[in-house]
Amino acid sequence: MMQTKPIYFPALESVQAAAKNLKGVAIKTPLSQNTNLSKQFGANILFKREDLQVVRSYKIRGAYNKMSFLSDDEKQRGIVCASAGNHAQGVALSCKLLAIKGTIFMPSPTPNQKIEQVKMFGEAFIDIVIEGDTFDDAFAAAKQECDTKKKTFIHPFNDEKVIEGQATVGLEILEQTKEKIDYLFVPVGGGGLSSGLSTIFKKLSPETKIIGVEPEGAPSMLTSINNKKNTALDKIDPFVDGAAVKKVGDLNFEICQKNLSQVITVPEGKICQTILDLYNKDAIVVEPAGALSIAALDFFTDEIKGKNVVCVVSGSNNDITRTAEIKERALLFANLKHYFIVKFPQRAGALKEFVVDILGPNDDITHFEYTKKNNRTNGAAVVGLQLKSSKDLAPLINRMKDNNFFGDYLNDKPDLFQFLV
């Protein structure tokens, strides 16, 4: 009879050892109340500010803990990782601190800002190799490098020592408050943070409900739990790049399947709203994955009322060049941004008529593409409009139809819409 391998769970002693190991490397990040959200939800909302961590994310914890356990021979041969973001920065800094040579594979679309950050943290101890168009391409090249040169691969999440390092976030939270924590919201990507945190809370705060939060466009953990087996997704929306993975780690899946009270998904547009709200109201800058746990609160308004709630803010490595897209997605989610094909009569004054008679006093044209064609009665234009209120949409469409300007509504046509957003 074939024996089933027991599920690995991080031992409390191993996580405590990781915490000692990380002293002087990772900082003990604040656990602080967010006044605005506490008032909004009628709850005590606490942020665990891993966005203030060294390398601006929790990833240094797992990377350094894993690499510090390498043998002298493994350190001498060097390490390899594949990443387009926070894991690469954590590995790079760990290479410098431990004096280990590292090779970091990054896909070609990686923003130059992130490449420069990795260079800054790793200095002379790392080499960066740009390989392939996707993370999977970079990952395959990194694994081949390990096989041919006998180097150690530092996995971003599917590794015991990495999980134990990330679990130290949980130890800190429970040390920083004496209040009973009713809800813990934790972002889920590959599952390193969620598997580590959930194990610590199951051991030390078993009554806490642990909610894993994934982006709607990359529900790899939720899909796997529903299927009762680790399942790779065919495709994902890469927008929430710090949490968009096609397949979670095998170790991480087994732990999270047992430990998480619930896994939910949050629309990318809601995540963008949260990013903007945090910046405008609290001057907090987060990356999309860093906003996941906070974005989930709107889906638990009744459950968390009067409760003590912790949201893990996982990182702040946001690329400033993405600001326009974040604003656009937030407006679309709020039903305030709309795209149309508008039929303009080929005569003088048609545009003025559209602006004066069709648009409302608070409607704003944000996008306009039009080419006049003299051999046609009507010319089609692609028009983007920003509304003051979502209630203004139906009257706007009625005015367009009544005056023969309406051609088509593009927001619900994904094949066309993807070229605009």
Predicted region positions:
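PLP-dependent amino-acid enzyme catalytic core
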Residues: 1-421
